[in-house]
Amino acid sequence: MKLATKKIKTLGKSKPDLSKKKPAKDAIRKTKPQTTSETKVTPRNPKQKVAEPVKNGKTTKKGFKKSHKEELEGLKDIDPEFYDFLKNNDKKLLDFNLLDTDDDDDEEGDEEDKEDTVTKESKDDEDDEEKYHKPSKDLEVASDESDFEVDEEDDAAAGGIQKITLNLLHQWEQQLGQANISIDIVRKVIQAFNSALASISADGADGGENKHNAAAFKVVGAAAFNGVIQLCVIHLQPAIIRLLGVRPNSSLPLHKHKKWVKVRGCLRYYLTDLIRLVEQVSSPNILGVLLKHLHQMAGMVVPFSALGKTILKRLVVLWSTGDETVRVLAFLCILKITRKQQATMLNHVLKAMYLAYVRNSKFVSPNTLPGINFMRRSLVEMFALDLNVSYQHVFLYIRQLAIHLRNAVILKKKDSFQAVYNWQFINSLRLWADLLGASANKPQLQPLIYPLVTIATGVIRLIPTAQYFPLRFHCLQTLISLAKETNTYVPVLPLIVEVLKSNTFNRKHSAVSMKPVQFTCVLRLNKGQLAENGFRDEVIEQVCGLLLEYLAHESTSLAFSDLVVPTVMAIKTYLKECRNANYARKLKQLLEKIQESARFIEQQRGKSSVTFDIKDAQAVAAWEQQLRLKRTPLDVYYASWLKTHETKKRRQAAHTDEINADYDVPKLKKLPVKTGVPVRNENGEVELFPSDSEDEGDDGLHLGSDDDDDEDVQEEEEVEVEHPKAKKAKKEKPEKQKPRPATVEDDYDEAGGAVDIVKDLDLNEW
């Protein structure tokens, strides 16, 4: 116990010894620079407390290393062999400079830590006072005018990259307009164009083959970008023409000039960038400008076959899916590029354009129909460039149509029928019929007329029901156009007259449609449309129009009077059973013109001028040509009908109120909202059928002479039924003034009705 207490006492005595070191630490703290009274002294972290002993230790270690270095230096004189051994086996031991450098770095690090500690406390006041950043009052705002200024500092910082400014572009424009053009300025402009594309690319870098040129210039801002594009589009092509020394009337290709080698490489890069820009642009206006420029550069695409295929591929896409103006410009570019290298490019272009035509003619609507018609006409022009090359394609594609038709006839399944009864098939028939008609004076494609006529006739007879009457009329129109253009007899009259014998057509309609049915963009009708009166009206219009068009063309034939005998008999048979006065009137008028033309032909044949043999084809053709100059009665009637029909078609496409009036469509007046108060006129009398029309004497029905008597009777009955309803409105609010009894004569005058309740009917609302 005594020993234990002694140990405890000794431990207790050791405490004052430790406390003696505190004044030394306080003395060290006092040596630090004093801060202002406003600053707050922050306590030291643990790392700062152990900084001084470490420093002392490093100082001792440095002296030890210094003495060790001297000993090793002395070893070189005392034992050279051992020194060489260390030098060969342990070089680090003798690397005194490396050791000294590490020590110096440690010392410098300690000094920097010490200085940071001092400056940190001295800047506490500034951190508190300037806690928030205060911007300068002399800041400058960037604007588009900075594009005119050359920023030399940016150029130096960018490592030689020159910034495109409007002043620089103006200098280039002047250099491009000079008579003697340097190849260097052309290369600079093309490099600037590449840099402009790199500035708008998705990843911000140039994705083309001219990637190294993009580092030469830097395009910043919309003004600089537009300036570069405008410079290339307007001034580059004329400058290259002057550089090559092309004469105005020279027929020598551009790639055969002497200086072509100098511009070949940069032009290849430029055309690549140009078509890449065309792919990225979606604005029709900008596309139009770029395509016009590409049309000027078409002669420079010839030497680059691979690049030419890429350009044509993109142009075909624009030709088939772009805006109307873009379509036309794309086709002009395709035509110009293809004609300059027709031997190598025509096959690829024809195949690509036909596939694009079929792909984009799958659906036909009033909006897509003009584009499809343009593609068909332009594609006919492309096939007509070389009929020998086109024959292989036309024969192959007509054969594909025949295979689809054969499968439908043999299999008789829904899928096989749908492969034939679709817009792609019908538009293909139209395309080949137009092509054969356009090349009628050349013998290369004439053997394909008979297969095409056979296919079209087979399509009509595949499903001869009333639901597919629109498709039948489309095929008949194609055959009639082919017969007129090729001057070939095609037996379409039986296919037209057959429609009049349809039970569905002759059945009385069970539904009334105010809006007429149009077959222009329709191939098939549903059961509801078959029951409407608009279906029968359109069928009669189509039958009369097709008969008139075909017979007007054949009216100058030597055998016309014999040709129309079956048709005349079929029309007379239908007129005996027809109950609709409108249909009977139209067919009677057509029948009279047919018979009049037949008598005219018989008179011409009975004259003494016909002295040739019927087997003499040339004499028959000459006689028919003279007859065309005299104009047959049916031909004159068809010309007047066609003029009226085309006018109605153009107005129908416009969808205006004036068109509806010209179409004799009745209009409906919208009655005011019923508020329980009867509408009175100026005399205080109740109006049974109020109207907004100011002209009370105008006939608003516009029904004309085409209306049936039965329909007129029904309208009178409807008017008589509505009179009691108007009298009920009179009883709701009694007045002292007794209204005069309403009669039918009050609302309808001798002209047929001054007040019209169906005057403002808009077809778009139904």
Curated annotation (Swiss-Prot):
Cellular component aspect of the GO annotation: Noc1p-Noc2p complex; Noc2p-Noc3p complex; nucleolus; nucleoplasm
Record-level Gene Ontology MF annotations: histone binding; transcription corepressor activity
Regions of compositional bias (Acidic residues) in chain numbering: 100-115, 141-154, 706-720
Gene deletion effect: Ubiquitous RNAi-mediated knock-down is lethal between first and second instar with reduced larval size. Conditional RNAi-mediated knock-down in proliferating cells of the eye and antenna imaginal discs is viable but results in small eye size and disorganized ommatidia, possibly due to excessive apoptosis. Conditional RNAi-mediated knock-down in cells of the prothoracic gland impedes pupation, probably due to reduced ecdysone hormone levels.
Subcellular location: Nucleus
Start-end of Basic residues biased regions: 1-12, 58-67
Region (Disordered): 1-73, 100-154, 674-766
PTM-bearing positions, type Phosphothreonine: 101
Residues bearing the modification Phosphoserine: 143, 146, 691, 693, 705
InterPro entries in alphabetical order: ARM-type_fold, Noc2
Compositional bias segments (type: Polar residues): 33-42
Keywords noted in UniProt: Nucleus, Phosphoprotein
Listed Basic and acidic residues bias regions: 14-29, 130-140, 757-766
Biological process, per Gene Ontology: negative regulation of transcription by RNA polymerase II; ribosomal large subunit biogenesis
Family note: Belongs to the NOC2 family.
Descriptive protein name: Nucleolar complex protein 2
Organism: Drosophila melanogaster
Lineage of the organism: Eukaryota, Metazoa, Ecdysozoa, Arthropoda, Hexapoda
